[in-house]
Amino acid sequence: MKKISLLGATGSIGTSVLEVVRKFSDQYRIVAMAAGRNIDLFARQIEEFSPDLVSVLDEEYAHCLQERLGGFRGKILWGNAGNEEVAAYPSASITISAIVGAAGLLPTLAAIEAGKDIGLANKETLVMAGKIVMERARRKGVALLPVDSEHSAIFQALHAGKRADLAKIILTASGGPFHGRTAAELAQVTPAQALAHPNWSMGRKVSIDSATLMNKGLEVIEAKWLFDVEPENIEVVVHPQSIVHSLVEYHDGSLIAQLGVADMCIPIAYALSYPNRLPLGHKRLSLTDCACLDFIRPDTENFPALPLAFEALRRGGVAPAALNAANEIAVAAFLDGKIRFLDIARLVTDTVDVVSPGDENKLDDILAADRESREITRQKITELF
Protein backbone atom coordinates (compact mmCIF):
# COMPACT_ATOMS: atom_id res chain seq x y z
CA MET A 1 0.00 0.00 0.00
CA LYS A 2 1.59 3.28 -1.13
CA LYS A 3 0.68 6.20 1.11
CA ILE A 4 0.21 9.64 -0.45
CA SER A 5 0.26 13.25 0.73
CA LEU A 6 -1.74 15.46 -1.63
CA LEU A 7 -1.24 19.21 -1.92
CA GLY A 8 -3.99 21.01 -3.84
CA ALA A 9 -6.68 18.37 -3.32
CA THR A 10 -9.63 20.38 -4.63
CA GLY A 11 -7.99 21.66 -7.81
CA SER A 12 -8.12 20.12 -11.27
CA ILE A 13 -5.03 17.94 -10.73
CA GLY A 14 -5.95 17.09 -7.15
CA THR A 15 -9.39 15.79 -8.06
CA SER A 16 -7.84 13.69 -10.85
CA VAL A 17 -5.33 12.24 -8.36
CA LEU A 18 -8.22 11.24 -6.14
CA GLU A 19 -9.99 9.68 -9.13
CA VAL A 20 -6.97 7.41 -9.66
CA VAL A 21 -6.69 6.60 -5.95
CA ARG A 22 -10.42 5.82 -5.81
CA LYS A 23 -10.05 3.36 -8.68
CA PHE A 24 -7.00 1.67 -7.13
CA SER A 25 -7.87 1.89 -3.45
CA ASP A 26 -6.24 -1.49 -2.85
CA GLN A 27 -2.87 0.02 -3.84
CA TYR A 28 -2.98 3.64 -2.61
CA ARG A 29 -4.14 5.53 0.45
CA ILE A 30 -4.34 9.29 1.03
CA VAL A 31 -2.84 9.98 4.47
CA ALA A 32 -2.59 13.79 4.31
CA MET A 33 -4.35 16.44 2.22
CA ALA A 34 -4.18 20.21 1.77
CA ALA A 35 -6.62 22.54 0.05
CA GLY A 36 -7.44 26.24 -0.09
CA ARG A 37 -10.91 27.80 0.02
CA ASN A 38 -13.20 25.11 -1.41
CA ILE A 39 -14.35 23.81 1.96
CA ASP A 40 -17.49 22.06 0.68
CA LEU A 41 -15.57 19.86 -1.76
CA PHE A 42 -12.68 19.35 0.65
CA ALA A 43 -15.03 18.17 3.40
CA ARG A 44 -16.53 15.58 1.03
CA GLN A 45 -13.05 14.42 0.03
CA ILE A 46 -11.99 14.05 3.66
CA GLU A 47 -15.12 12.05 4.46
CA GLU A 48 -14.40 9.72 1.55
CA PHE A 49 -10.64 9.24 1.90
CA SER A 50 -10.21 9.58 5.71
CA PRO A 51 -6.74 11.18 5.85
CA ASP A 52 -4.90 11.52 9.15
CA LEU A 53 -3.96 15.16 8.59
CA VAL A 54 -5.50 18.02 6.60
CA SER A 55 -4.70 21.69 6.05
CA VAL A 56 -6.62 24.67 4.65
CA LEU A 57 -5.90 28.29 3.73
CA ASP A 58 -6.26 29.95 7.14
CA GLU A 59 -7.63 29.55 10.66
CA GLU A 60 -11.12 30.73 9.71
CA TYR A 61 -11.41 28.06 7.03
CA ALA A 62 -10.06 25.51 9.51
CA HIS A 63 -12.89 26.31 11.93
CA CYS A 64 -15.44 26.06 9.11
CA LEU A 65 -14.02 22.69 8.12
CA GLN A 66 -14.13 21.43 11.71
CA GLU A 67 -17.80 22.37 11.94
CA ARG A 68 -18.55 20.62 8.64
CA LEU A 69 -16.76 17.41 9.57
CA GLY A 70 -18.03 16.99 13.10
CA GLY A 71 -16.56 13.63 14.11
CA PHE A 72 -13.30 13.90 12.13
CA ARG A 73 -10.58 12.36 14.28
CA GLY A 74 -7.62 13.63 12.30
CA LYS A 75 -5.68 16.83 12.74
CA ILE A 76 -6.71 20.09 11.03
CA LEU A 77 -4.02 22.69 10.31
CA TRP A 78 -3.90 25.85 8.21
CA GLY A 79 -1.64 28.22 6.31
CA ASN A 80 1.86 27.69 4.98
CA ALA A 81 2.93 25.76 8.06
CA GLY A 82 0.00 23.41 7.63
CA ASN A 83 0.82 22.81 3.97
CA GLU A 84 4.42 22.03 4.84
CA GLU A 85 3.37 19.57 7.55
CA VAL A 86 1.05 17.83 5.09
CA ALA A 87 3.84 17.72 2.49
CA ALA A 88 6.28 16.11 4.93
CA TYR A 89 3.80 13.79 6.67
CA PRO A 90 5.95 10.94 8.06
CA SER A 91 3.98 7.93 6.82
CA ALA A 92 3.67 9.18 3.21
CA SER A 93 6.11 7.79 0.66
CA ILE A 94 5.17 10.23 -2.11
CA THR A 95 3.89 13.80 -2.07
CA ILE A 96 1.82 15.06 -5.00
CA SER A 97 2.54 18.78 -5.36
CA ALA A 98 -0.53 20.18 -7.13
CA ILE A 99 -0.94 23.60 -5.49
CA VAL A 100 -1.18 26.26 -8.20
CA GLY A 101 1.44 29.00 -8.23
CA ALA A 102 4.35 30.08 -6.07
CA ALA A 103 2.55 28.81 -2.97
CA GLY A 104 3.69 25.31 -3.92
CA LEU A 105 7.42 25.99 -3.56
CA LEU A 106 7.97 25.80 0.20
CA PRO A 107 5.74 22.75 0.79
CA THR A 108 7.53 20.92 -2.03
CA LEU A 109 10.89 21.76 -0.49
CA ALA A 110 9.58 20.52 2.87
CA ALA A 111 8.60 17.21 1.28
CA ILE A 112 12.04 16.86 -0.31
CA GLU A 113 13.78 17.58 3.00
CA ALA A 114 11.60 14.87 4.57
CA GLY A 115 12.81 12.40 1.93
CA LYS A 116 9.53 12.06 0.03
CA ASP A 117 9.40 11.27 -3.65
CA ILE A 118 7.59 14.07 -5.47
CA GLY A 119 4.85 13.83 -8.07
CA LEU A 120 5.35 17.31 -9.48
CA ALA A 121 2.39 19.14 -10.98
CA ASN A 122 3.38 22.52 -9.53
CA LYS A 123 5.66 23.81 -12.29
CA GLU A 124 6.31 27.06 -10.39
CA THR A 125 8.50 25.13 -7.94
CA LEU A 126 11.13 24.61 -10.64
CA VAL A 127 10.45 27.92 -12.40
CA MET A 128 11.28 29.84 -9.25
CA ALA A 129 13.98 27.71 -7.67
CA GLY A 130 14.97 24.99 -10.11
CA LYS A 131 18.63 24.86 -9.15
CA ILE A 132 17.92 24.70 -5.42
CA VAL A 133 15.15 22.11 -5.81
CA MET A 134 17.15 19.78 -8.05
CA GLU A 135 20.24 19.98 -5.83
CA ARG A 136 18.22 19.21 -2.70
CA ALA A 137 16.42 16.35 -4.42
CA ARG A 138 19.74 14.82 -5.47
CA ARG A 139 21.16 15.25 -1.99
CA LYS A 140 18.16 13.57 -0.40
CA GLY A 141 17.96 10.85 -3.05
CA VAL A 142 14.31 11.54 -3.87
CA ALA A 143 12.68 11.10 -7.26
CA LEU A 144 10.99 14.02 -9.02
CA LEU A 145 8.28 12.42 -11.15
CA PRO A 146 6.56 14.79 -13.60
CA VAL A 147 2.77 14.98 -13.57
CA ASP A 148 2.36 17.57 -16.35
CA SER A 149 1.37 15.69 -19.50
CA GLU A 150 4.21 17.25 -21.52
CA HIS A 151 6.95 16.51 -19.00
CA SER A 152 5.61 13.03 -18.39
CA ALA A 153 5.82 12.47 -22.15
CA ILE A 154 9.45 13.62 -22.21
CA PHE A 155 10.25 11.52 -19.14
CA GLN A 156 8.89 8.45 -20.93
CA ALA A 157 10.58 9.23 -24.26
CA LEU A 158 13.95 9.62 -22.53
CA HIS A 159 13.80 5.93 -21.64
CA ALA A 160 14.26 5.16 -25.35
CA GLY A 161 17.89 6.27 -25.50
CA LYS A 162 20.96 7.47 -23.64
CA ARG A 163 21.11 11.00 -22.29
CA ALA A 164 24.43 11.49 -24.08
CA ASP A 165 22.60 10.97 -27.38
CA LEU A 166 19.90 13.58 -26.69
CA ALA A 167 19.72 16.38 -29.26
CA LYS A 168 16.70 18.33 -28.01
CA ILE A 169 13.31 18.08 -26.41
CA ILE A 170 10.19 19.32 -28.15
CA LEU A 171 7.29 20.57 -26.03
CA THR A 172 3.91 20.61 -27.72
CA ALA A 173 1.37 23.34 -27.03
CA SER A 174 -2.31 23.24 -27.94
CA GLY A 175 -2.15 26.93 -28.83
CA GLY A 176 -5.05 27.60 -26.47
CA PRO A 177 -8.41 29.02 -27.50
CA PHE A 178 -6.92 31.93 -29.49
CA HIS A 179 -4.53 30.16 -31.84
CA GLY A 180 -4.43 32.07 -35.12
CA ARG A 181 -6.03 35.24 -33.74
CA THR A 182 -4.66 38.66 -34.71
CA ALA A 183 -3.48 41.29 -32.23
CA ALA A 184 -6.64 43.30 -32.90
CA GLU A 185 -8.77 40.28 -32.08
CA LEU A 186 -6.74 39.45 -28.97
CA ALA A 187 -7.24 42.98 -27.68
CA GLN A 188 -10.97 42.29 -27.40
CA VAL A 189 -11.04 38.85 -25.77
CA THR A 190 -12.82 38.39 -22.46
CA PRO A 191 -11.91 36.25 -19.43
CA ALA A 192 -14.80 33.91 -20.25
CA GLN A 193 -13.42 33.33 -23.74
CA ALA A 194 -9.90 32.79 -22.40
CA LEU A 195 -11.13 30.20 -19.92
CA ALA A 196 -12.69 28.05 -22.66
CA HIS A 197 -9.80 25.71 -23.50
CA PRO A 198 -10.54 23.56 -26.57
CA ASN A 199 -8.94 20.32 -25.34
CA TRP A 200 -8.16 20.26 -21.61
CA SER A 201 -10.17 20.82 -18.45
CA MET A 202 -8.00 23.02 -16.23
CA GLY A 203 -8.20 25.54 -13.42
CA ARG A 204 -8.78 29.23 -14.07
CA LYS A 205 -5.21 30.43 -13.72
CA VAL A 206 -3.70 27.66 -15.84
CA SER A 207 -6.38 28.19 -18.49
CA ILE A 208 -5.37 31.85 -18.87
CA ASP A 209 -1.70 30.87 -18.98
CA SER A 210 -2.53 28.43 -21.76
CA ALA A 211 -4.31 31.19 -23.68
CA THR A 212 -1.30 33.54 -23.45
CA LEU A 213 1.24 30.70 -24.00
CA MET A 214 2.80 31.61 -20.65
CA ASN A 215 1.97 28.10 -19.49
CA LYS A 216 4.25 26.74 -22.17
CA GLY A 217 6.90 29.27 -21.24
CA LEU A 218 6.81 28.11 -17.63
CA GLU A 219 7.02 24.52 -18.86
CA VAL A 220 10.15 25.40 -20.84
CA ILE A 221 11.82 26.60 -17.64
CA GLU A 222 10.58 23.54 -15.77
CA ALA A 223 11.97 21.27 -18.49
CA LYS A 224 15.40 22.92 -18.33
CA TRP A 225 15.78 21.92 -14.69
CA LEU A 226 13.91 18.64 -14.71
CA PHE A 227 15.82 17.22 -17.67
CA ASP A 228 19.09 19.20 -17.42
CA VAL A 229 18.92 20.73 -20.91
CA GLU A 230 19.91 24.18 -22.10
CA PRO A 231 17.34 26.63 -23.53
CA GLU A 232 18.73 26.27 -27.04
CA ASN A 233 17.93 22.53 -26.87
CA ILE A 234 14.26 23.11 -26.06
CA GLU A 235 11.77 23.71 -28.88
CA VAL A 236 8.08 24.53 -28.67
CA VAL A 237 5.60 23.65 -31.42
CA VAL A 238 1.86 24.28 -31.52
CA HIS A 239 -0.07 21.05 -31.91
CA PRO A 240 -3.79 21.92 -31.84
CA GLN A 241 -5.01 18.33 -31.54
CA SER A 242 -3.23 17.72 -28.18
CA ILE A 243 -2.54 14.09 -29.11
CA VAL A 244 1.26 14.15 -29.22
CA HIS A 245 2.09 15.29 -25.71
CA SER A 246 5.78 15.99 -26.40
CA LEU A 247 8.80 14.52 -28.16
CA VAL A 248 12.49 13.84 -27.74
CA GLU A 249 14.96 14.08 -30.63
CA TYR A 250 18.19 12.07 -30.57
CA HIS A 251 21.43 12.75 -32.43
CA ASP A 252 20.66 10.11 -35.06
CA GLY A 253 17.56 12.05 -36.09
CA SER A 254 15.07 9.76 -34.36
CA LEU A 255 12.03 11.43 -32.82
CA ILE A 256 10.41 9.57 -29.92
CA ALA A 257 6.92 10.79 -29.02
CA GLN A 258 4.27 9.91 -26.44
CA LEU A 259 0.70 9.98 -27.73
CA GLY A 260 -2.61 9.65 -25.95
CA VAL A 261 -5.98 11.21 -25.30
CA ALA A 262 -6.14 14.46 -23.31
CA ASP A 263 -6.61 12.81 -19.91
CA MET A 264 -4.57 13.95 -16.90
CA CYS A 265 -5.25 10.67 -15.11
CA ILE A 266 -2.70 9.02 -17.43
CA PRO A 267 0.41 11.00 -16.35
CA ILE A 268 -0.87 11.04 -12.75
CA ALA A 269 -1.20 7.25 -12.71
CA TYR A 270 2.27 6.86 -14.22
CA ALA A 271 3.82 9.09 -11.55
CA LEU A 272 2.07 7.10 -8.81
CA SER A 273 2.93 3.67 -10.22
CA TYR A 274 6.35 4.33 -11.82
CA PRO A 275 8.07 2.30 -13.17
CA ASN A 276 4.89 0.25 -13.61
CA ARG A 277 1.62 1.23 -15.30
CA LEU A 278 -1.96 1.03 -14.08
CA PRO A 279 -4.85 -0.36 -16.18
CA LEU A 280 -6.95 2.80 -16.00
CA GLY A 281 -9.73 1.59 -18.24
CA HIS A 282 -10.25 5.11 -19.61
CA LYS A 283 -10.88 6.04 -23.22
CA ARG A 284 -7.90 5.18 -25.42
CA LEU A 285 -6.56 6.89 -28.51
CA SER A 286 -7.69 5.42 -31.82
CA LEU A 287 -5.08 6.23 -34.44
CA THR A 288 -7.56 5.71 -37.26
CA ASP A 289 -9.70 8.49 -35.80
CA CYS A 290 -6.80 10.96 -36.07
CA ALA A 291 -7.42 12.56 -39.45
CA CYS A 292 -4.24 14.64 -39.19
CA LEU A 293 -1.63 15.84 -36.74
CA ASP A 294 -0.57 19.46 -37.21
CA PHE A 295 2.65 21.00 -35.90
CA ILE A 296 3.03 24.77 -36.27
CA ARG A 297 5.61 27.34 -35.20
CA PRO A 298 4.29 29.46 -32.33
CA ASP A 299 3.23 33.03 -33.07
CA THR A 300 5.67 34.78 -30.74
CA GLU A 301 4.71 38.25 -31.98
CA ASN A 302 1.09 38.08 -30.86
CA PHE A 303 1.87 35.73 -27.97
CA PRO A 304 5.02 37.27 -26.45
CA ALA A 305 4.79 35.37 -23.15
CA LEU A 306 6.65 32.41 -24.65
CA PRO A 307 9.78 34.35 -25.71
CA LEU A 308 9.59 36.24 -22.39
CA ALA A 309 10.00 32.95 -20.56
CA PHE A 310 12.94 31.93 -22.75
CA GLU A 311 14.56 35.30 -22.06
CA ALA A 312 14.04 34.98 -18.30
CA LEU A 313 15.62 31.54 -18.42
CA ARG A 314 18.65 32.88 -20.28
CA ARG A 315 19.01 35.78 -17.82
CA GLY A 316 18.96 33.38 -14.90
CA GLY A 317 19.21 34.60 -11.33
CA VAL A 318 15.79 35.57 -10.00
CA ALA A 319 14.36 36.54 -13.41
CA PRO A 320 12.22 33.37 -13.72
CA ALA A 321 10.81 33.92 -10.21
CA ALA A 322 10.01 37.53 -11.11
CA LEU A 323 8.39 36.41 -14.36
CA ASN A 324 6.17 33.96 -12.52
CA ALA A 325 5.17 36.37 -9.75
CA ALA A 326 4.30 39.19 -12.16
CA ASN A 327 2.28 36.79 -14.28
CA GLU A 328 0.28 35.53 -11.29
CA ILE A 329 -0.73 39.08 -10.36
CA ALA A 330 -1.47 40.08 -13.96
CA VAL A 331 -3.59 36.99 -14.61
CA ALA A 332 -5.62 37.63 -11.45
CA ALA A 333 -6.17 41.23 -12.58
CA PHE A 334 -7.34 40.05 -16.01
CA LEU A 335 -9.76 37.57 -14.45
CA ASP A 336 -11.09 40.39 -12.27
CA GLY A 337 -11.66 42.57 -15.34
CA LYS A 338 -9.06 45.16 -14.34
CA ILE A 339 -6.77 44.76 -17.36
CA ARG A 340 -7.02 43.48 -20.92
CA PHE A 341 -5.65 40.21 -22.27
CA LEU A 342 -2.65 41.78 -24.03
CA ASP A 343 -1.75 43.74 -20.90
CA ILE A 344 -0.67 40.54 -19.14
CA ALA A 345 2.55 40.11 -21.10
CA ARG A 346 3.27 43.86 -21.04
CA LEU A 347 3.06 43.96 -17.25
CA VAL A 348 5.29 40.91 -16.94
CA THR A 349 7.89 42.45 -19.25
CA ASP A 350 7.94 45.74 -17.38
CA THR A 351 8.25 44.04 -14.00
CA VAL A 352 11.02 41.61 -14.92
CA ASP A 353 13.03 44.50 -16.38
CA VAL A 354 13.11 46.43 -13.09
CA VAL A 355 13.13 43.80 -10.32
CA SER A 356 16.23 43.80 -8.14
CA PRO A 357 18.91 41.24 -9.10
CA GLY A 358 19.40 38.18 -6.94
CA ASP A 359 21.20 34.85 -6.64
CA GLU A 360 19.39 31.73 -7.87
CA ASN A 361 21.35 29.74 -5.29
CA LYS A 362 19.76 31.63 -2.38
CA LEU A 363 16.17 30.87 -1.44
CA ASP A 364 15.84 34.18 0.40
CA ASP A 365 16.75 36.07 -2.79
CA ILE A 366 14.15 34.11 -4.77
CA LEU A 367 11.41 34.75 -2.22
CA ALA A 368 12.37 38.44 -2.06
CA ALA A 369 12.13 38.69 -5.86
CA ASP A 370 8.73 37.02 -5.72
CA ARG A 371 7.45 39.56 -3.18
CA GLU A 372 8.99 42.55 -4.97
CA SER A 373 7.64 41.51 -8.36
CA ARG A 374 4.12 41.14 -7.00
CA GLU A 375 4.26 44.59 -5.45
CA ILE A 376 5.67 46.19 -8.61
CA THR A 377 2.98 44.60 -10.75
CA ARG A 378 0.20 45.65 -8.38
CA GLN A 379 1.50 49.23 -8.41
CA LYS A 380 1.62 49.28 -12.21
CA ILE A 381 -1.95 48.02 -12.42
CA THR A 382 -3.09 50.72 -9.99
CA GLU A 383 -1.22 53.47 -11.84
CA LEU A 384 -2.04 52.47 -15.41
CA PHE A 385 -5.55 51.07 -15.30
Swiss-Prot record:
Required cofactor names: Mg(2+); Mn(2+)
Residues given in the record as 1-deoxy-D-xylulose 5-phosphate binding sites: 123, 149-150, 174, 197, 210, 215-216, 219
EC numbers for this chain: 1.1.1.267
Binding, Mn(2+): 148, 150, 219
Entry-linked Pfam families: DXP_redisom_C (PF08436), DXP_reductoisom (PF02670), DXPR_C (PF13288)
Main EC class the enzyme belongs to: oxidoreductase
GO biological process: isopentenyl diphosphate biosynthetic process, methylerythritol 4-phosphate pathway involved in terpenoid biosynthetic process
Molecular function terms from GO: 1-deoxy-D-xylulose-5-phosphate reductoisomerase activity; manganese ion binding; NADPH binding
Origin: domain of life: Bacteria
Pathway(s) where this gene product acts: Isoprenoid biosynthesis; isopentenyl diphosphate biosynthesis via DXP pathway; isopentenyl diphosphate from 1-deoxy-D-xylulose 5-phosphate: step 1/6
Catalytic activity: 2-C-methyl-D-erythritol 4-phosphate + NADP(+) = 1-deoxy-D-xylulose 5-phosphate + NADPH + H(+)
Family per record: Belongs to the DXR family.
Function according to Swiss-Prot or TrEMBL: Catalyzes the NADPH-dependent rearrangement and reduction of 1-deoxy-D-xylulose-5-phosphate (DXP) to 2-C-methyl-D-erythritol 4-phosphate (MEP).
The name this protein goes by in its record: 1-deoxy-D-xylulose 5-phosphate reductoisomerase
Record lineage: Bacteria, Pseudomonadati, Thermodesulfobacteriota, Desulfobulbia, Desulfobulbales
Encoding gene per record: dxr
